[in-house]
Amino acid sequence: MANNMLHRYLFKDLSVRGELVQLDDTYQQMISSQEYPAAVQHLIGELLVATSLLTATLKFEGSITLQLQGNGPVSLVVINGDNNQQVRGVARWKGDIADDASLHDMLGKGHLVITIEPKQGERYQGVVGLEGDTLAQVLEGYFERSEQLKTRLWIRVGKHDGKACAAGMLLQIVPDGKGSAEDFEHLEQLTNTIKDEELFALPAEELLYRLYNQETVQLFTPQQISFRCGCSRERSAAAIVTVAREEINDILAQDGAVALHCDYCGTTYSFDSAQVAELYAPSSANGSTLH
């Protein structure tokens, strides 16, 4: 398996473009930060694959956030990815969740929020109802209504060689007016034959050849996908000094230290009374080192 890679490809004669995402370590890092139930791990994997596929459509510097919200036992699953394919994610749940729980079992009545944030330009946000049995179907409906581009997604989460992995494919008509519905349906039928093990394990070139060996496929340079939460001790320190000193002193008196926990990666940053005093000292504003 080409670990943690995004591959873009184009059917030049058919005006259809495609994407392939294969993840192992990046997905494993994301689900290891908390003791997620198996079904929640699966949903995180699906949303992670979907986010990487959608982030690949960005034609500018920026990020996409996919956020599932609901009134069920899983209240939130959120994945953020940027144009450099740096991703992070977290989920909120309560109670016991069956291993075979479906999307609707977990979220109940809910929706998907898609937020696109360019570094320059206006922020866009769309809200999509959970229409369909799977996340892939929900997103296909979104593309049909908002982009008016025929789009299909295949998203799989499972294990390969005993390790968690997630993968997916996307097909979309290129908006040049040349792609036909018949050509797209032909490629859909070919892609429907993909097996989980092939999607998890085969190199991109071999996988695409198995599926589309009668077609002319242009495969572009792949892009690495990496887990990056963005937390640091410095950022935690900066957050502490935004809180009133009296409130921080109360925490120190009660707990002996101020601790900030990153839900994305599971790291806890702890500051004792001496370190807190250093943060509030005038010299800290001039770039003193945090230990």
UniProtKB/Swiss-Prot annotation:
Keywords annotated in UniProt: Chaperone, Cytoplasm, Disulfide bond, Redox-active center, Zinc
Record GO biological process: protein refolding
GO cellular component: a single term: cytoplasm
Intrachain S-S bonds: C229-C231, C262-C265
PTMs per UniProt: Under oxidizing conditions two disulfide bonds are formed involving the reactive cysteines. Under reducing conditions zinc is bound to the reactive cysteines and the protein is inactive.
Matching Pfam families: HSP33
Major subcellular site: cytoplasm
Location within or outside the cell: Cytoplasm
GO molecular function: protein folding chaperone; unfolded protein binding
Source domain of life: Bacteria
Entry keyword annotation includes Zinc: yes
SUPFAM superfamilies noted in UniProt: Hsp33 domain (SSF64397), HSP33 redox switch-like (SSF118352)
Keyword Transport attributed: no
InterPro entries: Heat_shock_Hsp33 (IPR000397), Heat_shock_Hsp33_C (IPR016154), Heat_shock_Hsp33_N (IPR016153), Hsp33_helix_hairpin_bin_dom_sf (IPR023212)
Family under the similarity heading: Belongs to the HSP33 family.
Function: Redox regulated molecular chaperone. Protects both thermally unfolding and oxidatively damaged proteins from irreversible aggregation. Plays an important role in the bacterial defense system toward oxidative stress.
HAMAP family: HslO
Protein name per Swiss-Prot or TrEMBL: 33 kDa chaperonin
Source organism of the structure: Vibrio cholerae serotype O1 (strain ATCC 39315 / El Tor Inaba N16961)
Lineage: Bacteria, Pseudomonadati, Pseudomonadota, Gammaproteobacteria, Vibrionales
